[in-house]
């Protein structure tokens, strides 16, 4: 019996595929963390996975509506093998988003908590050596109100491209954005959490096989917007070295355009908090339970009130357009892109409550433009001209619907991306643009057959979903391998090009870009006509100022 036990004990430390069977344990500045090894078919080196590693103290009590603080140290080996809870958010939408964009084979268990400042790490490195691999830090999307790190499995990207992948979480909704406009609650807690995670990466990622001097931040939708905020923020200096914004940038958003006093009067009424002073209101809101704040958040949605990133003089010293014009930002190489049909299916599905009878026609388009006109930086007087420009006398209802959805895709994603890319180029930044146009098989049964390149579709290919999920075609698998190679080459070198790949031109005065899909090819002047139309229209019709808007606060 003792011999049997001895044999098994010896096997437990016997190197197999270059690794012992013992799970990985890594030192961090707070203490040791225990992970797990996961092997991917075709790769000798397993990936070391660490889930739910804390990068800040739980933002509870007095730390609600306050800057994140470093995590408390621990003296034991912390188990980092389970997914962390997502930050506080609407559970129904959290499940929809998680199930829709997850690159996992299995449906993730849904856990939500205000204690949520954790990150996940996927490292293909031999942790017994100093590997100095490129690091890619993912910032999830979800409108800054829903989402989490764990649906995005970094296993395939990490193994195939030999990079360390980190997925981070940050406070959302009222927890991540509430601002009084003064020192009592300046706001931008979501972005301060993102910055805290990046500082943690600088201090710790070398022990996980990563190179802290080669960090790429990348994100989609509001994650892409967050990437651009961090690029424009002086607080981002030296925390990252390359950036990728997928389907979202900070240009033409509602950043800094909210009248804080008007919004907070509504929050005060909903919460029954005394708003006679900022300090009293913040203190009152800190006493509310998580469920009470969730209820308040739900009512804000009913009132069509959205909180936003603020021009606080710290995270963002000025309006994004001013920072870009002054060229006073982190001039790191940058990939900017969006998808062919950003409003193809998922976003209209999420806006069903705003669509009368689910129809998309001139009346609905006008309604939505009026609903979002302050966020879009347009005046209501412009709306008829905008609709006429896109419809151009078309009578067929199906074609009208398609053109209107294209219009919203341009307004929210395409035109801001081009404007940012031009500003980056003019500042001397190495810039690359793409348009993604492909229909993943994973969602083919959920959406109309005509939708190709919907919002978020590129995520499946960036994270190697065809290599993780069952049923992918050879074309999908090859497309994913190509996209991962582009993204990882950029993370390694600041240039996506490499051997065996279609050439991706740098975005210069010729405005060359890459169309990525079943056929991947170069093209020029992405959305040039649409940008020219909007630029001319805005010059003739400056946005109106109304009681619910203002330019900035300091």
UniProtKB/Swiss-Prot annotation:
Stretch forming the signal peptide: 1-18
GO cellular component: endoplasmic reticulum lumen; extracellular space
Enzyme class: hydrolase
Catalytic activity: a carboxylic ester + H2O = an alcohol + a carboxylate + H(+)
Biological processes annotated in GO: response to bacterium
Residues annotated as the enzyme's active site: 221, 342, 455
Family listed: Belongs to the type-B carboxylesterase/lipase family.
Protein name: Carboxylesterase 1C
């Amino acid at each position: 019996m003792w011999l049997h036990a001895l044999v098994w004990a010896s096997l437990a430390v016997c190197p197999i595929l270059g690794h012992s069977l013992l799970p990985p344990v890594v030192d961090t500045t707070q203490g040791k963390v225990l992970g797990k090894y996961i092997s991917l078919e075709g790769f000798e080196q397993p990936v070391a996975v660490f889930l739910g590693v804390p990068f800040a103290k739980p933002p509870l009590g007095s730390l609600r509506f306050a800057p994140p603080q470093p995590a408390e140290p621990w003296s034991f080996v912390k188990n980092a093998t389970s997914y962390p809870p997502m930050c506080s958010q609407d559970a129904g939408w959290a499940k929809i988003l998680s199930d829709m964009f997850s690159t996992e084979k299995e449906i993730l268990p849904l856990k939500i908590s205000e204690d949520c400042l954790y990150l996940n790490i996927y490292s293909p490195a031999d942790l017994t050596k100093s590997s100095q691999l490129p690091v890619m830090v993912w910032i999830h999307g979800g409108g800054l109100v829903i989402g989490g790190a764990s649906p995005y499995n970094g296993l395939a990207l990490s193994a195939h491209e030999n990079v360390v992948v980190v997925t981070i979480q940050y406070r959302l909704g009222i927890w991540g954005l509430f601002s009084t406009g003064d020192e009592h609650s300046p706001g931008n807690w979501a972005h301060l959490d993102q910055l805290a995670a990046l500082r943690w990466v600088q201090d710790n990622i070398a022990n996980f096989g990563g190179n802290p001097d080669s960090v790429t931040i990348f994100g989609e939708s509001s994650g892409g917007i967050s990437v651009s905020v961090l690029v424009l923020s002086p607080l981002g200096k030296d925390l990252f070295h390359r950036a990728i914004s997928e389907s979202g940038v900070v240009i033409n958003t509602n950043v800094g355009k909210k009248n804080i006093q008007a919004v907070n009067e509504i929050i005060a009424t909903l919460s029954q908090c005394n708003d006679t002073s900022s300090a009293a209101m913040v203190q009152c809101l800190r006493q509310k339970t998580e469920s009470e704040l969730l209820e308040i958040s739900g009512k804000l949605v009913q009132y069509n009130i959205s909180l936003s990133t603020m021009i606080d003089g710290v995270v963002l010293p000025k309006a994004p357009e001013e920072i870009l014009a002054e060229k006073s930002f982190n001039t790191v190489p940058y990939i900017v892109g969006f998808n062919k049909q950003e409003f193809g299916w998922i976003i209209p599905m999420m806006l069903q409550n705003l669509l009368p009878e689910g129809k998309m026609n001139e009346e609905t388009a006008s309604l939505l433009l009026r609903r979002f006109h302050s966020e879009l930086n347009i005046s209501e007087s412009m709306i008829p001209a905008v609709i006429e420009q896109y419809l151009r006398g078309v009578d067929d209802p199906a074609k009208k619907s398609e053109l209107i959805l294209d219009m919203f895709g341009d307004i929210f994603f395409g035109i801001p991306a081009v404007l940012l890319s031009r500003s980056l180029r003019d500042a001397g930044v190495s810039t690359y643009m793409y348009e993604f146009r492909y229909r993943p098989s994973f969602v083919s049964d959920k959406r109309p057959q005509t939708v190709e390149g919907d919002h978020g579709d590129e995520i499946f290919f960036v994270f190697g979903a065809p290599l993780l999920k069952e049923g992918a075609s050879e074309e999908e698998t090859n497309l994913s391998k190509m996209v991962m190679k582009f993204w990882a080459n950029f993370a390694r070198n600041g240039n996506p090009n490499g051997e065996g790949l279609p050439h991706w031109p740098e975005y210069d005065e010729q405005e060359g870009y890459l169309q990525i899909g079943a056929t991947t090819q170069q093209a020029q002047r992405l959305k040039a006509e649409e940008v020219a139309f909007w630029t001319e229209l805005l010059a003739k019709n400056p946005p109106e100022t109304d009681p619910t808007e203002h330019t900035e606060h300091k």
